[in-house]
Amino acid sequence: MARILILLLGGLVVLCAGHGVFMDKLSSKKLCADEECVYTISLARAQEDYNAPDCRFIDVKKGQQIYVYSKLVTENGAGEFWAGSVYGDHQDEMGIVGYFPSNLVKEQRVYQEATKEIPTTDIDFFCE
C-alpha cells in the first residue's frame, strides 16, 4: 500500500512539474515596436544587480546587456517593468525572456520606437 502511495505521489509531482502557472498580470497593456511584439525595441545595460522575485522576472547582473522586447504600461502606481532577455556569452545562446524594473537599466541603443499599444494576455505572465 505504501509503495502505491509513493508511486502516486511521484506521478503527481511529475504531472505538476510539467505544467505551467498563470501568474497575476503586472499590467493590462504593453508598448511594442510591432503588432506581434517580436521585434527588439532597444539594447539596454544593467546599472545594478536584480534578483527575480518570481518566475515572471529575470535575474540581471550589473553590466549585462538586455534586449528589450516590450514595455508594460504603468497602472495604479505600480512600477514600470520591461520585458527582455539577457543573452549568454555565445552569440547564438538566447536567454530566457522575463520582466525587470525599467529603472534598473540604461538604454544604450534604440532600434525601433515602442509606439504600438497592445493589450497584454494571460500568456504574457505564464510561468513554467
UniProtKB/Swiss-Prot annotation:
Subcellular location: Secreted
Top-level division of the source organism's lineage: Eukaryota
Record key words, sorted: Disulfide bond, Secreted, SH3 domain, Signal
Domain SH3: 39-110
Alphabetical list of InterPro entries matching this protein: OTOR, Otoraplin_SH3, SH3-like_dom_sf, SH3_domain
Cystine pairs: 32-37, 55-127
Pfam families found in the cross-reference section: SH3_2
GO biological process assignments: cartilage condensation
Predominant location category: secreted
Residues annotated as signal peptide: 1-18
Coiled coil: none
Tissues expressed in: Highly expressed in cochlea.
Gene Ontology CC annotations of this record: extracellular region; Golgi apparatus
Family as reported in the entry's similarity comment: Belongs to the MIA/OTOR family.
Classification via PANTHER family: OTORAPLIN (PTHR47146:SF1)
Protein name, as recorded: Otoraplin
Biological source species: Mus musculus
Gene name linked to the record: Otor
